[in-house]
Amino acid sequence: VPYSAEPVMAAGIREFTFHDGGGPVLQGLDVAVAPGSLMAVLGTSGSGKTTLGRLLAGWLPPGPGGNLIGFLELTGTRLQFNGDAGDPRIDPAQWGRQVGFVPQDAGAVLSTVRATVAEELAFGLENSAVGRTAMVAAVEQTAGLLGLRNLLGRHPARLSGGQLRRLAIGCAIITRPPVLIMDEPFASLDAAGARELGDLVRGLVKAGTAVVILSQMVDGVLREADNWIVLADGTVKASGTPAALEAGSPAVLAGIRRIKDGPSPGGVAPVPRSAGHSAPALELRGVSFGYRKDGRPARQGFTWQRRQGSRTTDNQSTVLQGIDLAVHPGEIVAVTGPNGAGKSTLLRHFNGLLRPTTGTVLVQGEDISGKPVGSTAAAVGLLFQHPREQLFERTALREVRFGLDRLFGQDEAGERASAALAAVGLSAAAHEQPAELPASRQRLLALATVLARKPAVLALDEPTVALDGDGLAVLDAAVRSAAAEGAAVVLVTHDLGYARSAAHRTIALDAGRLAEA
């Protein structure tokens, strides 16, 4: 890739294979990125983007991580690899001082041993023996860049998905590495967060950082990149400037989502005939929820102190306030709102994972207070924002079938599991290890585990994250099919185009309150 400046990072990958005996996952691939430049690596699910990013970032070092035939070059030092025992070894810690990395799973970059956002940001600086005065200044500056100043005292475990991604980006840039690689950094961010991240990327590039963004979607700052590389099946399908590739054959960018392409492929969903004429499948009446000073959920019957905004006067945080919501069979409702608004918290009330401080949750007309979560889960299927939280079996088929034999018997369990895998396009992956699937397929697999039970209520937390165009079409078809069969669907999303297309109505959650959008 030609640049006017010498590259700060380069790679020539003749072949990269994992130790599982399979074929090459990357091959015939050359990458070079110069200081003060922005490169976008684009591709559909399974194209090799994440593998390339982890290899360049030192998170998948040749040798322990797999066999590389080719070279890696960083800040003028080239390491040659022949795929044998004589190859050099990369020290991930040393490499990481030069290359900041934000993985697709934002939580993986955190130390997990720090109790606040501020301490997590400072962790890398502490390891580099930065003085306290400089450390405090760097934490404040980085928090300001990423909209985290009001969250510096919060425990990372209580962050929303978008807030967690902002924190991961902050941890990667606070030490000012010359190279920054981010895998799907815009996932889970609200519109304001995406704009702020775009401004941050522009500022880093202007300051001389080499930025590489891996993405299955093109929008915003990626259109300003110096170069696009399009991957398919682990090799370069095309490369060039954004203008040149967008003006070329549509086949080059097939499957890569572009906002200008419009919303989802299914068109606007028809209003279900049952809406307003049947009893709600899900109903929330006056639901409020918050946390006590010690970070634990406030118990039912807890008396709130006088509120100031979204917080009580004694620092007990209120997340949901007086929520009234009814969703009928066959209805699709989208919930939007800024990061940290409480959208995931709202969904976790549907099956009793969280209990309201005040108010009532009814599923199919029955108050679920006091009912075990397991019994409610038969009627309420919840897709978590992070699909790995609900994947644990050895194969995709076992994952979907888990618990079905006991509920439906062996014959019906097998039929349901096979049908659910087919509904999300994963029949061919039935015997694959879930942990080895790309993030998009993990999300679809987690969805299949929910669909197989045919719940009365389907609650989906950020279901479009990490999906390419093909994956979005699969999701869209599955959601519409579930609604057509009578499920009440509630989906939380920052993908406003998809929300407008798929949902019968869209409601916004902000400052703990719901309003029709």
Task: Please give the residue ranges for each predicted region.
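Helix-to-loop junction immediately C-terminal to a conserved catalytic motif
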Residues: A57, N351
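Conserved ABC transporter NBD signature motif
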Residues: G65-G83, G359-D367, T376
